[in-house]
Amino acid sequence: KDLIQEGKIKAWGISEVNEDYLRRAHAICPVTVIQNRYSMMARWHEHLIDVCQELRITYIAFSSLANGALTGAYHSQADFKDDQQDFRRNMPQYSQTGMIKTNALLEVISQVAKKYHATNAQISLAWMLYKFPHLIPIPGSRKVDRLSSNFQAGNIQLLETDIQMIDHQLEQMEFEVFGGH
C-alpha cells in the first residue's frame, strides 16, 4: 500500500489466489488484478469471476485453452515426446484417460465450431468471453498464425442456445486437467 501511495507502483495483483486470501488482501490494499487458471476444463475458480466483478478487480485467465487440449491439435502425451522441455508431456489431460474425457468435450466444441466456421480454440475462447465479458483470457500461442486466429475469437457472437448446450454438456463432464483441485 505504501508503494502505491509513494508512486513507486501503480497497481498490484495476485496469481493463483482463492477467495478468502483475495478478500483479505483487498481489504488491506485494493487489488487491481488477479491471474488464475480458467478454461472449459478448469472451472474451479469460476466463483472468483463474480467476486472480482463485485470488488472491481480484473480477472486474467491463464491456460484458457487448457494448455492446448481445447484446440484439438494434440492427441496424447506422445505428441510432446520429442521436446523434453515441454511440460505438457506429463499433464493429466494428455494421459490416456484424460484424452478420453477431453475428446468428449472436443466433440461438442467441434460441432459448434463447424456451425460458425471457426476453430475449436476460437469457440472455447468465445464461450469464455460470452459468459464473462470482463474476463481477459491469455491463451498461450507458439505460432503467430495461432495468435491471430485466437484473437478472432472476439469477433464470434455465439448464440445463447449454443452457450446453453455447451454448459449443459460441461455440467455432465469431469476432466483430468493440470492444476485441478
Regions found by a protein language model. Name each.
Residues 1-180:
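Beta/alpha (TIM)-barrel catalytic core signal, keyed to glycine-rich beta->alpha loops juxtaposed to Asp/Glu
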